[in-house]
Amino acid sequence: MYVVLEGVDGAGKSTQVGLLKNKFKNALFTKEPGGTKIGESLRRIALNENISELARAFLFLSDRAEHVESVIKPALKEKKLIISDRSLISGMAYSEFSSLELNLLATQSILPTKIVLLLIDKEGLKQRLSLKSLDKIENQGIEKLLTIQRNLKTHAYALREKFGCKVLELNAKESVKNLHEKIAAFIKCVV
């Protein structure tokens, strides 16, 4: 089973992934972008270099293609539980150039079985971002991140509608413990 956690920066994905590592010790934990050695290099270029948005989108698509080929496919073949911090959903939400068609090509149509969507309101996002150093995307501001969050939700539900992916939508302002319990139960529930 392939499970992804999605949400804007500051929604608590990394915290939840950390807790899930203790709960699902035999799972394969990965991330996008940067889930492979090549992916780390592509991610660094995409986030830190002054390049066009189109070039950035293709770097992330390249990372996604390599990630699926070298990490996701082998783990699925071994019937492992895969838990990923981000996926193609982020790729589509963060870039105007990253379409579903391009992402299906990059992922060889391998899609998450389950999507955990952590959503946060404007005040919660402001508070959390004030506590960390910001990257190029986060520096675009709260309104930009809220637009990205709406896109994440739209794309997650589009995958549910078109491909049957299961979606668990959570309020990221709930307690870390409550969120963890709900996410763990969602992962354990085999439909």
UniProtKB/Swiss-Prot annotation:
Catalytic activity of the protein: dTMP + ATP = dTDP + ADP
Query: Does this entry carry the keyword ATP-binding?
Result: yes
Q: What is this protein called?
A: Thymidylate kinase
Matching entries from Pfam families are given as:
Thymidylate_kin
**What family classification does the UniProt entry report for this protein?**
Belongs to the thymidylate kinase family.
Cite the Gene3D superfamilies for this sequence. Answer: P-loop containing nucleotide triphosphate hydrolases
Name the gene that codes for it: tmk
What PROSITE patterns does the entry give? Answer: THYMIDYLATE_KINASE (PS01331)
Binding-site list for ATP:
7-14
Q: Which GO terms describe its molecular function?
A: ATP binding; dTMP kinase activity
Q: Relate the protein's function as given in its record.
A: Phosphorylation of dTMP to form dTDP in both de novo and salvage pathways of dTTP synthesis.
Entries under InterPro entries matching the protein: P-loop_NTPase, Thymidylate_kin-like_dom, Thymidylate_kin_CS, Thymidylate_kinase
Report if keyword Hydrolase is assigned.
Answer: no
What are the UniProt keywords, alphabetically? ATP-binding, Kinase, Nucleotide biosynthesis, Nucleotide-binding, Transferase
Q: Which organism is it from?
A: Helicobacter pylori (strain P12)
Q: Which GO terms describe its biological process?
A: dTDP biosynthetic process; dTTP biosynthetic process; dUDP biosynthetic process
Q: Spell out the GO cellular component terms annotated for this protein, sorted alphabetically and separated by semicolons.
A: cytosol
Query: Which EC number(s) does UniProt give?
Result: 2.7.4.9
